[in-house]
């Protein structure tokens, strides 16, 4: 089974409600030491720290909570768009849950998250309250659940769609869910099926390949699709449109920066 979803051009964000390492206060250290050393009681963690559930949020590679990462700054554009996205997702997280998503549209300062890619959003004007669904959108594409032993359960693509529907969040748009061979039944499994499948998928008009973005008001190239294999693992593959790659290459040649490169 596979899932094929829209690949959107934004910035990655992660929100989690997971076990975190907390330093003990001086009084708590003393209590823990007495409990363990003098009374022979088993304590959670060590005399120096303990574990408890807490909320974390991050970009693709940088934890943004300043009490966990003292070096965390406002990021590439001088504003913490990840905190606004976390405010949208955080209320729905259960203990052990981590949500992965793309943030698209505009920044609080009115600039694009990714130049030209509005995804139906409008830029906030001076004095406007930065609003989800108006100025920016959060599109969830992956969810995991981690138990107290550190074992991770990967939500299926269908479960991601169902969970988002249940809590009124927005998942990435799903184009197809089913068996790969059923998408193009005319292809022979015995004759270079993998190559032929990818060639047809790369030009699939139903998925807007090599067309303009179907979800942006601006005329910009559709980025492509993400193919996720339903095998209880985090196994997904990106198939980008050549028109998008050409546009991205020209931007790099001009020296234009990218929010993803800095976060």
Predicted regions and their residues:
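Core nucleotide-handling region used for phosphoryl-transfer chemistry
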Residues: 1-263
């Amino acid at each position: 089974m596979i899932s094929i979803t829209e690949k959107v051009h934004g910035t990655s964000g992660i929100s989690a409600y997971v076990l975190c390492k907390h330093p003990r206060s001086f009084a708590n250290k003393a209590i823990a030491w007495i409990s363990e050393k003098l009374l022979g009681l088993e304590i959670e963690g060590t005399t120096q720290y303990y574990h408890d559930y807490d909320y974390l949020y991050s970009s693709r590679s940088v934890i943004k909570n300043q009490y966990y990462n003292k070096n965390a700054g406002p990021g590439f554009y001088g504003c913490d768009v990840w905190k606004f996205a976390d405010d949208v997702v955080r209320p729905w997280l259960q203990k052990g849950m981590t949500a992965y998503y793309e943030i698209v549209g505009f920044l609080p300062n009115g600039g694009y998250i990714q130049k030209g890619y509005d995804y139906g959003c409008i830029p906030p004007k001076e004095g406007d309250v930065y609003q989800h669904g108006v100025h920016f959108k959060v599109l969830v594409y992956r969810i995991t659940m981690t138990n107290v032993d550190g074992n991770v359960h990967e939500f299926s693509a269908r479960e991601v769609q169902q969970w988002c529907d249940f809590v009124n969040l927005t998942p990435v748009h799903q184009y197809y869910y089913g068996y790969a061979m059923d998408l193009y039944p005319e292809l022979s499994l015995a004759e270079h099926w993998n190559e032929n499948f990818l060639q047809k998928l790369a030009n699939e008009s139903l998925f807007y390949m090599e067309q303009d973005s179907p979800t942006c008001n601006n005329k910009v190239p559709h980025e492509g699709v993400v193919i996720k294999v339903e095998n209880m693992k985090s196994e997904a593959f990106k198939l980008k449109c050549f028109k998008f790659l050409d546009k991205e290459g020209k931007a790099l040649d001009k020296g234009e920066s990218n929010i993803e490169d800095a976060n």
